[in-house]
Amino acid sequence: MENFSLYLPTFYEFGRGSVDKVGSLTTAMGCSRVLIVYGRAHAKTSGLIDRVESALRHSAIEYDELGGVQPNPVDTLVRQGIALARDRHIEGIIAVGGGSVIDTAKAIAAGVPYKGDFWDFYGGGKTITEALPVGVVLTIAAAGSEGSGNSVITNVATRQKLGARTASILRPRFSIIDPALTVSLPPYHTACGITDMMAHILERYFSPTADVEVTDRLAEGLLMAIIDEAPKGMASPDNYQARANITWASTMAHNGILGCGRVEDWTSHAMEHEISALYDVAHGAGLAVVFPAWLTFMVDHKPAKVAQLGRRIFAIDIADDRLAAIETVARLKAFFKVVLGMPSTFAELGIAEPDIDAMVRGLHKVKGEMVGGYYKLNSSDTRSIYRMML
């Protein structure tokens, strides 16, 4: 295990009816005027925005709205939000939605006090040193952005999907997590979210760092809980307890605890970002295609950890690492495909003729000649992995 620093400043309010506390939590955040950021329609039509605004009014907090966040959120709306926040003297951002909404809110929060272009933090190598405070009302269990200091935005002009990472500055000051708000999600979006949270765990699990048994076991336990609870949540969307377990697993998957003292990988996320930047596919669906392909490559290059995963979460009883790894990949692919209904190929993502050369170029332009923490991949390797998705 390596040395590490950990700071988790987010206050979590979890459970039924917790939305009604948004006013008092915003007051505690030190804000008297906020910008409410949300998606295209559901938060409005469901009455959730009305509930949030009622709670804010009850606490004498003024607010403005910015709707229209789309999956794979874009820089153009962030720029609109920054201008609005500056014009209206906004003191904080309240994100009502899932990862795309939260990431947009974080980007706006970082951009308001910055004198330059906010994209400098994503594609220009600039470090975020200050931001408006962000609060969250979560509606989708998936990205884990409600507990992380990260944000991912797509640049429409350059067709780049890039992230900004901070240890604490972009972490929400509070996150309201009411699993009942996820009940109305369509099954496909629930499945995409489950895939995403599992990928967040696996990106940290596949590490070259030795002697990390505590975080290995935490990761394995979360994966086993998700694998147990996901079928219940998919079969009965109104199963509150299944939703509660899935939602909390999503937060735990990406709040930083699982990465303590270990090198992380993140190749699969980077490869998926190239796909969704070019073709605008759902992030979770893209990961369902990418991660098994990456694992398949590892079967012949570094199978031991893949085998360990299968033995511990799927009870695979095969002594040979390579053979155990093959079975692990098959079990994971079956879970994504059969239980969650996720795609497994480019064609099933709706991409008839994927531009693999463009993906490889984009990936290595951002990440450098060699990619990955668990196993270093060159452009020939990543091209091979993309071709496994055909």
Regions from the PLM with identified roles:
Residues R51-V52, I82, V101-K115, G147-S148:
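Short Gly/Thr/Asp-enriched flexible loops that form oxyanion-binding sites at enzyme active sites
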Residues D20, P113-D211, Q308:
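A glycine/threonine-rich phosphate-anchoring loop and its flanking beta-alpha core
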Residues V19-V22, T45-L48, D75-L77, S100-K106, ...:
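Short glycine/serine/threonine-rich phosphate/pyrophosphate-binding segments
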